[in-house]
Amino acid sequence: KAPYRAALAAMIVVLAVACSGPSVGVDVKVEAKDPQATLDAALQADREFAAAVAKDGPKAAFLAWFHPTDSQFIDAGSYLKGAEAIAAPFEQSPPGFTIGWVPDSGVASPSGDFATTTGRFAVKMGDQTLQVGRYMTSWRKDEAGAWKVVMDATIADPPAPPTTTPDPDGRPG
């Protein structure tokens, strides 16, 4: 559990450095964009990606929205690189299997071509919730100007503590 939190923290630091602009002593000419407009566009892309998963299924949507080669997916049990590898586990998704998420915040670079969104996700099988947690998705504009996922990481919430029912004598059971 701790290594994944450390990995997520490291990604946030890298993103913060990337979004802070050029380093001291580096002469980089970047036309500044409105970071809020960039973030709004990335949040909209994230919502459209979630809608595509609901409409087209995870495999088709992941192939369409993840960058074909420069993308990575990290969760507690896997590290996958490239859209094909990331979409492959969804090849035979059983009926009733769904993944959904809602972005709630993010940050964007001043260059206007990179942003990270984060929010809550849920994985379900029919009415049964299999996993919920937080996700972080990093987006980069491709050569055509379309937003593509380059990094996606999830951290599941810890399981709820077991509930106990007192016995008739009032002792915890």
Language-model features: where?
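Bacterial N-terminal signal peptides that target proteins for export
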Residues: 1-8
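Bacterial N-terminal signal peptides
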Residues: 8-18
